């Protein structure tokens, strides 16, 4: 009996296997879409299985291998699909009919120098600073469409935004090519494991291809780019401090771009004369192929093309960033540039990203004299340009908030700027041969006759916001309270540079908080990408320099990039601030764990040494027993249930001799282990006599409640709205209700909620229970004196009225989610029955 059952089971399995094999074969032949869906379902199923097993288990390794094989199969199918839909690279169809230079950032305000070369088919980006991904939408460009990134010099200002660009892409996106500078891919791989779990994966979705300057050139159907490496002579005996810090392989790269000749236009009259029938034959002629007509005649493409040449073509562009005068000499000596210096050829555009200090040298003036030709347009994008508040969402949103609470939201720099920003040249400034360009400006290299795109216009004219009568009444009542509020304690002062979780949104940047203990002492808690740009908008150029000189310490809660990707910029700008103000340099104290230090060491090795500018206080917790402990295999350190260092740590004991408690006005600083990543911390500090607690990213944490007892103010993350407890638990974050509960148990006098998911771009959900306590909701650019803390909670009724449309949309989404969950629950119940 048992033997019969066994034979029957084997036969059934064989039948099922045959069915699956034939089914899979049919799918590959007939329907790629169904195959992809099937593979995705199997990956999801294997992921669920994987979660049930430890990563060290044999079953886990088998499932991992299965997922990897399935991914390769899916990638192969997607590659075939793309090949079927994309025209060949050498096809005349791929030659762009329009090409324009468009300035994303001119080095001032929120964004460092960068621009794009735009065609209808592709987007080429030159340098990718912090916040580039956040503000690409200004030019109606999705970061997913950026395939080619050209890096003129391997410094942080040029590469800081690349990881955000990569993370924003879909898994089936084309590979991203990094042109020019070396070691960038190596650095990106180093920081990859420290992306926030909110991204869903710590792997970059698209492949990255590095094309260093040693490859000499790049060519596609639209243009040819020649890499011109600029390597100054290496002075072994140089005592120059900068030459000691810059790595030998940091070569500047100039790019010579030459557009392919524009596609010739088909002359309809010639088609009629030659009696070419309508249909696919005309398409082949347009693609440059000869065709045979039904009557046997062979028609060559030249017989039907128009003899008119495209007018206004400016096909040659040179992009340069020379960091020193020696790099300029290398550019002049370059063999690729000799035809232009000798007058044999003429450039049409030259984009200068070099600093003014280099541009004003005799060598650079000599270069300009050699290239002196009225037909060349010299575009200068180097930070010395007009300061224009081009980011409409940031400035208009802050103006709205300032109209509500002027004491809490400062005017952003440039103060009192008002106007309309277009892609024309009205806001540029001419200086000798140069045009100092403004953000968003556009210059045509080729303008097709069919161009009919709606112009981009940012309206930043000073105007009263449109508010309801109820909102105006609430604002009037609030401003009356503002005048009556006592002003007896200015410090400590809190500034919120970023209040978004994981990724920046249109109205919110990622995490960054400033605590000013006095006029001469400041501390930064977390430094997400774009923090320096936000700081520059709040304090202005001169105020920012003074603030950086006053900055004594940076505290990093954990190593996710949305909490530390702006750190390198702060370090570099702080050093420049000391030099600019003529003050002796004072090392910056960096309090962090070892995961923050790993990418920093890689950056120092690959690009520029910054470790000597810091005094590091490592607050890592090592969940390992010392060597030689009993209870494990020889040579292996077994894990303990808890770290051998205490979960709460007095950081002041580990400070160097440069720490001055009186000057810093810092009497207490504790790092408290919280529930996020393995070495994530919250911070408890007593600044200027007041107790402030920063939760960092965490689930509700009892230890933080205990250590932060009776805090004057708690700044707690509130990533999710209530009802998302499962998401919060899975991603190790807190809901709004959980954050408020932590504050109540801590007996905090004031609670400010922050770190909202990007699904709440302007304002999070504002439940009524927030009104019962001193609870406020942080917005970017909120700058609050200590005696103004009671005012923050009074803004909630105004926000409900001002952002009524946004809150209504959030309510609709919540109801839809509840309904969907209910339907799924009912279906599961029916299946079980």
From Swiss-Prot:
Loss of this gene results in the following: RNAi-mediated knockdown attenuates the mitochondrial unfolded protein response as indicated by reduced expression of hsp-6.
Q: Where is this region: Disordered?
A: 624-652
Which terms are listed as keywords in the entry?
Answer: Endonuclease, Hydrolase, Metal-binding, Mitochondrion, Nuclease, Nucleus, Transit peptide, tRNA processing, Zinc
Q: Which InterPro entries match?
A: Metallo-B-lactamas (IPR001279), RibonucZ/Hydroxyglut_hydro (IPR036866), RNZ2-like (IPR047151)
The superkingdom listed in its UniProt entry is Eukaryota
GO MF annotations, alphabetized: 3'-tRNA processing endoribonuclease activity; metal ion binding
Name the cofactor(s) required for activity, per the record: Zn(2+)
Q: CDD domains attached here?
A: RNaseZ_ELAC1_ELAC2-C-term-like_MBL-fold
Family membership, please give it: Belongs to the RNase Z family.
Protein name (database record): Zinc phosphodiesterase ELAC protein 2 homolog
Organism ancestry = Eukaryota, Metazoa, Ecdysozoa, Nematoda, Chromadorea
């Amino acid at each position: 009996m048992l033997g019969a059952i066994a034979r029957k089971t084997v036969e059934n399995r064989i039948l099922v296997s045959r069915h699956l094999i034939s089914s899979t074969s049919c799918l590959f032949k007939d329907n790629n879409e169904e195959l992809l869906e099937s593979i995705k379902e199997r990956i999801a199923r294997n992921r669920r299985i994987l979660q049930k097993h430890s990563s060290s288990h044999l079953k886990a390794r088998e499932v991992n291998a299965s997922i990897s094989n399935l991914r390769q199969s899916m990638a192969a199918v997607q590659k075939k699909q793309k090949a079927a839909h994309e025209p060949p690279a050498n096809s005349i169809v791929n030659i762009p009919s329009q090409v324009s230079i468009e300035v994303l950032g001119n080095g001032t305000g929120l964004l460092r120098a960068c621009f794009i070369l735009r065609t209808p088919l592709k987007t080429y980006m030159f340098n990718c600073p912090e916040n580039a991904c956040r503000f690409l939408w200004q030019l109606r460009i999705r970061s997913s469409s950026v395939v080619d990134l050209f890096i003129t010099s391997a410094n942080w200002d040029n590469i800081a935004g690349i990881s955000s660009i990569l993370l924003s892409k879909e898994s089936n996106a084309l590979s991203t090519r990094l042109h020019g500078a070396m070691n960038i891919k190596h650095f990106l791989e180093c920081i990859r494991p420290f992306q926030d779990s909110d991204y869903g994966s710590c792997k970059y979705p698209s492949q990255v291809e590095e094309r260093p300057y040693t490859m000499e050139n790049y060519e596609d159907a639209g243009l040819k780019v020649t890499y011109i490496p600029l390597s100054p002579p290496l002075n072994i005996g140089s005592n120059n401090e900068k030459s000691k810090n810059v790595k030998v392989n940091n070569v500047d790269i100039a790019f010579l771009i030459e557009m392919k000749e524009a596609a010739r236009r088909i002359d309809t009259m010639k088609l009629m004369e030659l009696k070419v029938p309508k249909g696919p034959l005309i398409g082949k002629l347009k693609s440059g192929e000869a065709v045979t007509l039904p009557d046997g005649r062979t028609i060559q493409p030249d017989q039907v093309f128009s003899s008119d040449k495209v007018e206004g073509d400016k096909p040659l562009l040179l992009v340069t960033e020379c960091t020193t005068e020696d790099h300029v000499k290398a550019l002049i000596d370059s063999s690729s540039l000799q035809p232009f210096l000798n007058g044999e050829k003429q450039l049409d555009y030259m984009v200068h990203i070099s600093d003014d200090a280099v541009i004003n040298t005799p060598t650079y003036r000599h270069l300009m004299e050699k290239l002196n030709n009225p037909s060349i347009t010299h575009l200068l994008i180097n930070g010395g340009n007009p300061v224009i508040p081009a980011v409409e969402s940031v400035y208009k949103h802050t103006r709205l908030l300032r109209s509500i609470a002027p004491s809490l939201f400062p005017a952003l720099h440039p103060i009192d700027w008002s106007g309309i920003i277009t892609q024309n040249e009205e806001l540029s400034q001419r200086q000798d041969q140069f045009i100092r360009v403004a953000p968003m400006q556009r210059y045509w290299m080729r303008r097709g006759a069919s161009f009919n795109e709606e112009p981009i216009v940012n309206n930043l004219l000073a105007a009263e916001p449109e508010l309801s009568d109820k909102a105006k009444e609430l604002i009037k009542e609030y401003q009356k309270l503002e005048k009556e509020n006592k002003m007896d304690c200015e410090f400590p002062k809190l500034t919120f540079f970023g209040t978004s979780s994981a990724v920046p949104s249109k109205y919110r940047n990622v995490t960054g908080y400033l605590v000013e203990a006095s006029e001469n002492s400041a501390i930064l808690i977390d430094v997400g990408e774009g923090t320096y740009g936000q700081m520059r908008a709040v304090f202005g150029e001169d105020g920012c320099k003074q603030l950086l000189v006053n900055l004594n310490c940076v505290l990093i809660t954990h190593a996710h990039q949305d909490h530390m990707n702006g750190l390198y910029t702060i370090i570099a700008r702080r050093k420049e601030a000391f030099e600019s103000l003529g003050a002796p340099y004072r090392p910056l104290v960096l309090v962090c764990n070892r995961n923050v230090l790993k990418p920093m060491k890689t950056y120092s090795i690959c690009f520029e040494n910054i470790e000597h500018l810091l005094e590091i206080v490592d607050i890592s917790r090592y969940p390992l027993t010392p060597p030689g402990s009993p209870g494990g295999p020889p040579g292996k350190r077994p894990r303990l249930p808890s770290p051998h260092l205490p979960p709460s740590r007095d950081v002041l004991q580990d400070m160097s001799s440069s720490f001055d408690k009186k000057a810093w006005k810092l009497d207490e600083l504790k790092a408290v282990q919280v529930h996020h990543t393995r070495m994530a911390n919250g911070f408890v500090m007593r600044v200027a006599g007041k107790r402030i607690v920063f939760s960092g990213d965490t689930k509700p944490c009892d230890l933080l409640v205990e250590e932060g007892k009776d805090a004057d103010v708690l700044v707690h993350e509130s990533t999710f709205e209530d009802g998302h407890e499962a998401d919060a638990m899975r991603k190790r974050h807190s809901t709004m209700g959980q954050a408020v509960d932590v504050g109540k148990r801590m007996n905090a006098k004031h609670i400010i909620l922050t770190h909202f998911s990007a699904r709440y771009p302007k304002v999070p959900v504002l439940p009524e229970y927030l009104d019962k306590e001193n609870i406020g909701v942080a917005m970017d650019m909120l700058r609050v004196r200590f005696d103004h803390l009671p005012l923050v909670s009074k803004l909630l009724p105004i926000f409900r009225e001002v952002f009524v449309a946004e809150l209504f949309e959030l309510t609709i989404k919540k109801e839809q989610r509840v309904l969907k969950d209910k339907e799924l629950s009912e279906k599961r119940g029916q299946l079980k029955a």
